[in-house]
Amino acid sequence: MLLHIPGLFDADELARICEALERADWADGKVTAGYQSAKAKHNLQLPEGHALAKEIGSALIDRLWKTPRFMSAALPHKVFPPLINCYREGGNFGFHIDNALRQPKGSPERVRTDLSSTLFLSDPESYDGGELVIQDTYGVQQVKLAAGDMVLYPGTSLHKVNPVTRGQRYAAFFWTQSLVRDDSQRTLLFEMDNAIQQLTADVPDHPSLLQLTGTYHNLLRRWAEV
């Protein structure tokens, strides 16, 4: 399942974020890549634990926890603290699959990367290239969203970032360990939850709503890992 979550940051917030990122001290993005991925990764990244990355990441996670669409689709259990990257001057990241497990710096906790997320921070008109290209069961998807919008997709997906040939592309990215590790099961629960919400709005007193809601929770109880 590939999901677009719009409007997590407004224009004024994004302007302040990008202004701060322009003044930031960047490191080589290969630092957080696995052995195979490092060969394909050509970008810049704020170091893990960088104050600006923590500030942006904290604001992002706080908003996602209040976004029903994300909560329903991801069913989050653990979240790897968001990282911030920059692509410019031909920077790109060739096709790769993210490492299955991630361990935040200084933490004993490991996060299984069931879901990957990218939050676009730069106006798409301000740079050329930089599309996030995702291969899924429906073919190849090219994603280049408005600033402040986020895409959520399975961590098992082969994906890449096309070269940025003009301007610079700032983004936040992170991984989520879901309560339900299987993507097809998560998708089924997400679709069922959407149907329940729509029926609740259309026919709030229908007796089958109670049964359908019970079925949702029984499936979640069967598949969830806590």
UniProtKB/Swiss-Prot annotation:
InterPro entries documented for this protein: Oxoglu/Fe-dep_dioxygenase_dom, PKHD_C, PKHD_hydroxylase, Pro_4_hyd_alph, Pro_4_hyd_alph_FE2OG_OXY
Molecular function GO terms recorded: 2-oxoglutarate-dependent dioxygenase activity; iron ion binding; L-ascorbic acid binding
Domain (Fe2OG dioxygenase): residue spans on this chain: 78-178
Gene3D superfamilies (alphabetical): q2cbj1_9rhob like domain, Rabenosyn, Rab binding domain
One Gene Ontology biological process: DNA damage response
UniProt cofactor note: Binds 1 Fe(2+) ion per subunit.
The keyword Metal-binding is annotated on this UniProt entry: yes
Entry superkingdom: Bacteria
Positions of Fe cation binding: H96, D98, H159
Keywords recorded for this protein, A-Z: Dioxygenase, Iron, Metal-binding, Oxidoreductase, Vitamin C
Principal EC category: oxidoreductase
Coiled coil (UniProt feature): none
HAMAP family assigned to the protein according to its UniProt record, in alphabetical order: Hydroxyl_YbiX (MF_00657)
Protein name: PKHD-type hydroxylase Pput_0892
Biological source species: Pseudomonas putida (strain ATCC 700007 / DSM 6899 / JCM 31910 / BCRC 17059 / LMG 24140 / F1)
